[in-house]
Amino acid sequence: MKSRSESKNCRLAQASRVAVNKVLDKSSARGSRGKKKQDDNCDSAKRDKGVNGKGKQALDARLIDNVLEDRGCGNVDDDEMNDSDWEDCPIPSLDSTVDDNNVDDTRELTIEFDDDVPDAKKQKNAYRATAEDKVRAELVHKVHLLCLLARGRIVDSACNDPLIQAALLSLLPSYLTKVSNLEKVTVKDIAPLLRWVRENFSVSCSPSSEKSFRTSLAFALESRKGTAEELAALAVALLRALKLTTRFVSILDVASLKPGADRNESSGQNRAKMKHGIFRTSTLMVPKQQAISSYPKKSSSHVKNKSPFEKPQLGNPLGSDQVQDNAVNSSCEAGMSIKSDGTRRKGDVEFERQIAMALSATADNQQSSQVNNTKKVREITKISNSSSVSDQVISTAFGSKKVDSPLCWLEVYCNGENMDGKWVHVDAVNGMIDAEQNIEAAAAACKTVLRYVVAFAAGGAKDVTRRYCTKWHTISSKRVSSVWWDMVLAPLVHLESGATHDEDIALRNFNGLNPVSSRASSSSSSFGIRSALEDMELATRALTESLPTNQQAYKSHEIYAIEKWLHKNQILHPKGPVLGFCSGHPVYPRTCVQTLKTKERWLRDGLQLKANEVPSKILKRNSKFKKVKDFEDGDNNIKGGSSCMELYGKWQMEPLCLPPAVNGIVPKNERGQVDVWSEKCLPPGTVHLRFPRIFAVAKRFGIDYAPAMVGFEYRSGGATPIFEGIVVCTEFKDTILEAYAEEQEKKEEEERRRNEAQAASRWYQLLSSILTRERLKNRYANNSNDVEAKSLEVNSETVVKAKNVKAPEKQRVAKRGEKSRVRKSRNEDESHEHVFLDEEETFDEETSVKTKRCKCGFSVEVEQM
């Protein structure tokens, strides 16, 4: 019975080994690119027949379970089997799969792969931004940038709070306060302070409620817990309290300058990835030699025995427990953890774990080591899961979120570093010192674009993006116009310069106690040198940027250029020194790139073509704008039967030499005009007079002139010339201007007289209408009063007679009274001219009779149909 069991184990182990070797060969050929797919119905019948799939990548876990079950793994304790590395699954009987007498060792094990890759074209959402969308996106970008600048100034102002600084100094051990007395500050002097901050404060992932930042900072100091921004601000306040020149540095993660960029980031799979914080790859954050080790807290007596400024053990690797603690803290506090080697994914790690389990299951064929082998399999599983831990790097990995990306840190000026001192990068959250070269990779891993990095001090700000961005060409197109950005930062740079070089003076200026203009020139001269040295350093970084490895980067690169990616109106002249090669293409300095124009375009700059010059480039003219260009240039060069455009460089031009004006005659072109693109295009001895209808004055005096054509107006695919003023000889300038001024005065006088006459006519009409109204009132006022008195008497008599009549009868009586008034009014003077006003008209709806009345009492009844 025992030999039968051993034969089963040997045959099954051999089959497992053959299957694993095949899987390893196929996975190495494919590079583990497919996604792992678990087979839930992998029974013995399917293993005999095999399953056809698109690829081969996922190992059947059922095989390993059968091997472990047959080798006695069922005797393991329940506590060990409940580990998260194991899962329950049905185990088919071995009798159906292994025949005791006839075992076919050559049968194959087929493993399924799912190599379905989503089509990138289907995932890409087509979005075409309009001109209005682009303008709106640029405005949003600028407003967001200004808001983040204001936020940085608020944080910097809170760091100068004397109460917060005093509270931090009261918590700081006395041996760490000696750094304020040092004349030369180095990196090793700041390391103990940073270590103390990391030991006494922790990062809280949830931000504070809606409070002012100063209040939130005080609460974080009291609770020893806060956001990454608050901890960075506390570190700045602590170092400033120790009289160290410190700046608060922040990445301004503004809205995208392109309209559809933010929309695409938050749609589809990107939204899910940002929600769960899972990235495909992990990026190097900082070399472990530069990371500050976090050791457990020691007693005060033990700490005092050490030197207060002992150099940190940067070269000694951390222990295994410390590595695990640092990984947990990094993933919670700053969105950082341990990364896998290269670009391995979760599926690759799981795949290797299963292979390790299968290999360990077939490594030992003895029954006596069942439990030990099971523990060994579990140990190998844990090791394979943590095999991505490297002793040389600390990096970001799965679980990082954009909200936890390294957005803020601080810079400390160490005058003991180098000869002139330098600004040292200090990250109090992640425990990094002088690791500025790793910020770009950390921001990229956390899905943060490193477009603007601004340092704040005493209400001022300075752009230090060049210090942390090594690939400027990747962000240059994502930044706003440099002219606008420099104009915004101009007043802030002045404040920051004073803050980083003289803290007391800058603080008084920021609080309004001392104006900036009262600063002593002697104290600012040395400080200006430090600022100039920093500007020189940033400019040097820009000029010494490494060559991009992607050809597309050379299209709009500020320093380098490739001839292949030049515009059609650009050329290399001269072909300067070759700085390197990219995919076999030589790389030239951007200063060698020259812009080509037509000779008519060069005339606008006051340049003309030299004699015997050959066009540097000939381009085919677009048929859509052919007529426009022909009319504008006045020349239609036909080369080989097609309309072409000859382009010339600036080195082929010379200053414009036009014929001078002689005997008061203005030289004109073939169209009888002068093209005045600029003042350089005027013929010698002439002047351009930009006044409307001034040609009439010159024509009246018989002075020679030429219309001045200043440009074109494009409408409906055509060009219309724009004329403004005239060109005359210089000697006639004063005469024409005086005559034009006199003519303008005459026109103004005529206009004034015309307005006065029109006003007098309107007043006459108004007064005449008033007189007519008064005359009519005086003539007919008495007659109208008598008629009203008589009508009142008639009405009173009618009312007395109709006292006992009902309401409808009273209305009829009133109508009869009105008729009697009409009869009496007929006996009046026939010479009276009756006037019927609309206000005196009445209408009876029952009888459909309209009554018209005059002021004298005369009335007329009209029946309307």
UniProtKB/Swiss-Prot annotation:
Transmembrane segments: none
Gene Ontology CC: one annotated term: chloroplast
Gene Ontology MF term list: damaged DNA binding
Protein origin, superkingdom: Eukaryota
GO BP annotations listed: double-strand break repair via homologous recombination; nucleotide-excision repair; response to UV; UV protection
Motif range (Nuclear localization signal): 34-41
Covalent S-S links between cysteines: none
Family statement drawn from the similarity comment of this UniProt entry: Belongs to the XPC family.
Function per UniProt: Essential protein. May have a role in the nucleotide excision repair (NER) pathway. Promotes UV tolerance via dark repair mechanism (nucleotide excision repair).
Description of how the protein assembles with itself and partners: Interacts with CML19. Calcium is required for this interaction. Binds to RAD23B and PTAC12/HMR/PAP5.
Full protein name: DNA repair protein RAD4
Protein's organism: Arabidopsis thaliana
Gene responsible for this protein: RAD4
